A protein has these predicted regions:
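Membrane-embedded alpha-helical bundles of polytopic integral membrane proteins
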Residues: 1-153, 157-186
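Transmembrane alpha-helical segments of integral membrane proteins
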Residues: 58-62, 194-204
Length: 204
């Protein structure tokens, strides 16, 4: 539901700025791809099923042939981009919740499921956003990328990173992998910020 809702919002945003992705077909393809990846993460599908993802994406190209459009290449690009940008990342999230290798090593009796990693990632992202907003509002002076996002500042970026790392250290107390959580926090800070800038650029 979240995946399809996010994909729908992405396509609506693209339509507002003048593009025409094949919304209905792309959402149908996106739901199938999401299902395949999720079932693979559960161990219900083997790797061979993942090979169906490519022809499903190619089907969007074929369907565009039956629609009269002034810019079919751009429409195809944004139809596929929505799936790559929204559906696949959200489907991969399931691997963090169902990771028997990790949880067995941590001696956590979860029946192959635990919310530790998943909750940790989201809380770190929230800490990064909150820290960026707080430090940016109070101390913000130097713009991070004014042309794309006028409100983002370097002070906010570093403040968000600090709070994210502290949050990562806290989660590291649960499994003893403090260094790993710090690395995860830094990755979230960098790519979370890049994601925000990319979204701001699309909106503009």
């Amino acid at each position: 539901i979240v995946s399809m809702g996010g994909l729908y919002e992405f396509y609506m945003l693209m339509e507002k700025v003048g593009f025409k992705p094949k919304k209905s077909a792309a959402m149908a393809v996106g739901s199938l791809i999401y299902g395949i990846i999720v079932m693979y993460s559960f161990g219900e599908f083997n790797f061979a099923y993942l090979l169906f993802i490519f022809p499903l994406l190619v089907s969007l190209v074929a369907l565009e042939l039956f629609r009269k459009s002034k810019d079919p290449v751009t429409n195809i690009a944004f139809s596929v981009m929505g799936i790559l940008y929204v559906v696949i990342p959200l489907s991969i999230v399931n691997f963090f919740a169902y990771d028997p290798t990790y949880y067995n090593e941590m001696d956590i009796n979860t029946n192959n499921y635990s919310s530790l990693l998943l909750v940790g990632f989201f809380v770190i992202q929230w800490a990064n956003d909150s820290g960026a907003y707080l430090f940016g509002s109070l101390l913000g002076k130097y713009k991070l990328f004014e042309r794309i996002s006028p409100n983002k500042t370097w002070e906010g970026f570093y403040g968000g990173a600090l709070l994210a790392v502290i949050t990562g250290i806290i989660f590291g107390q649960f499994d003893g992998a403090v260094i790993h959580w710090i690395i995860v926090a830094l990755i979230i800070v960098i790519f979370g910020t890049l994601g925000d800038l990319t979204e701001s650029q699309i909106k503009r």
